[in-house]
C-alpha cells in the first residue's frame, strides 16, 4: 500500500507508464498522486487523460495551469496552440467525457494522516491551511458548474497579486487560481510576483521562492508541488518536494515514494533542442 507522487506529466504518456512499471505500481493497493499539468507539450495528452481517469479512486491529482488552459481551449475561449499538441485530445470521440471529468478535479490535496499537502505551484505563505481549503473549494465549485466558461474567460491576468479576505468575485478567483497554479516567486510579505521565471540564484531582489518564506502550512505540513521545472527538484527546504523535472523538455519524470522517501526517475523519450529551447522527439 504505497503512495507514489509524480511530477508534471505534460502528455508524456510513455514515460509515465514506464515509471509506474519501474516502481511496480499496483492500482488495487497503491495510490498515485499527480502534481497537475497532465497535458500539453508532450505527444500523449489524450492517452494520459484516459489512463489517469481509468484509475478512479487510486489517483489523487490537482489541476495545473496547462490543464486549465486546455479547458479554456475546449470552451472556445483560448486558442489551440500547435506547440501544445492538444488536437488529438480535442478531436477525440471521448473529449467531452474526459474534459468534463478534468474540470471536476481539485486544486488542492490534503492527507492529514501523512501531514502532506499537494498543489500544482505550491501554497502561498499568506494562507493557513483552512484558508487554502476554502479558496480551493471556491474555484472548484465554479469549475464544476455550468458557468465554468465565464470563469475561464476571466482567469487570465496577473492581478490582484496580494491576498486579502476582502477579495471577492472574479478578482478573488483569479488570485486563487494564480496562487495554486502559476506562483513561483513572492515578495517578503508573501505578495505574488507573476513575472520572474529566473532560477532562484538569479532572481532579482527582494523576490524569494514562495517556499523560502515561512508560512503556516509549510510549518506544519510537507508540501509537494510541480510547475517549476527549472528547479530540477533541487534547492527546497526539508519537507518541501519539487517534483517537476522537465520530462516534456527532455529532462526526467520523477516519482517520490512517500513511505521511504525514495526517488525514482524515468528519462524523457525526447531530447533538448537547444536552438529552439523546446524538446523534440528522440
Swiss-Prot record:
EC number: 3.6.1.41
Enzyme class: hydrolase
Family matches, as InterPro entries: ApaH, Calcineurin-like_PHP_ApaH, Metallo-depent_PP-like
GO molecular function terms listed in the Swiss-Prot or TrEMBL record: bis(5'-nucleosyl)-tetraphosphatase (symmetrical) activity
Claim: Hydrolase is one of the keywords in the record: yes
Gene3D superfamilies in the record: 3.60.21.10
Key words of the record: Hydrolase
Catalytic reactions on record: P(1),P(4)-bis(5'-adenosyl) tetraphosphate + H2O = 2 ADP + 2 H(+)
NCBIfam families for the chain: apaH (TIGR00668), PRK00166.1 (NF001204)
Similarity annotation: Belongs to the Ap4A hydrolase family.
Its biological purpose: Hydrolyzes diadenosine 5',5'''-P1,P4-tetraphosphate to yield ADP.
Family annotation (HAMAP family): ApaH (MF_00199)
Protein name per the record: Bis(5'-nucleosyl)-tetraphosphatase, symmetrical
Gene (UniProt): apaH
Amino acid at each position: 500500500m504505497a503512495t507514489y507522487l509524480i511530477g508534471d506529466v505534460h502528455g508524456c504518456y510513455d514515460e509515465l507508464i514506464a515509471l509506474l512499471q519501474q516502481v511496480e505500481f499496483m492500482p488495487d493497493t497503491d495510490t498515485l498522486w499527480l502534481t497537475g499539468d497532465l497535458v500539453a507539450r508532450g505527444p500523449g495528452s489524450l492517452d494520459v487523460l484516459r489512463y489517469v481517469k481509468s484509475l478512479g479512486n487510486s489517483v489523487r491529482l490537482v489541476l495545473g495551469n496547462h490543464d486549465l488552459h486546455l479547458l479554456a481551449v475546449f470552451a472556445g475561449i483560448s486558442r489551440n496552440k500547435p506547440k501544445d499538441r492538444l488536437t488529438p485530445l480535442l478531436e477525440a470521440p471521448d473529449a467531452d467525457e474526459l474534459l468534463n471529468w478534468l474540470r471536476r478535479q481539485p486544486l488542492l490535496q490534503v492527507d492529514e494522516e501523512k501531514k502532506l499537502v499537494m498543489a500544482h505551484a505550491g501554497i502561498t505563505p499568506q494562507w493557513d491551511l483552512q484558508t487554502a481549503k476554502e479558496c480551493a473549494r471556491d474555484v472548484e465549485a465554479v469549475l464544476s458548474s455550468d458557468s465554468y466558461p465565464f470563469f475561464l474567460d476571466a482567469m487570465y491576468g496577473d492581478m490582484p497579486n496580494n491576498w486579502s479576505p476582502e477579495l471577492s468575485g472574479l478578482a478573488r478567483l483569479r488570485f486563487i487560481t494564480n496562487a495554486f497554479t502559476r506562483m513561483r516567486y513572492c515578495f517578503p510579505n508573501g505578495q505574488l510576483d507573476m513575472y520572474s521565471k529566473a532560477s532562484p540564484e538569479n532572481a532579482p531582489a527582494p523576490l524569494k521562492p514562495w517556499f523560502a518564506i515561512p508560512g503556516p502550512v509549510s510549518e506544519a505540513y510537507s508540501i509537494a508541488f510541480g510547475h517549476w521545472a527549472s528547479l530540477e527538484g533541487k534547492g527546497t527546504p526539508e519537507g518541501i518536494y519539487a517534483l517537476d523535472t522537465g520530462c516534456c523538455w527532455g529532462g526526467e519524470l520523477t516519482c517520490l515514494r512517500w513511505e521511504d522517501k525514495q526517488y525514482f526517475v524515468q528519462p524523457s523519450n525526447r531530447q533538448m533542442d537547444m536552438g529552439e529551447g523546446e524538446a523534440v522527439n528522440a
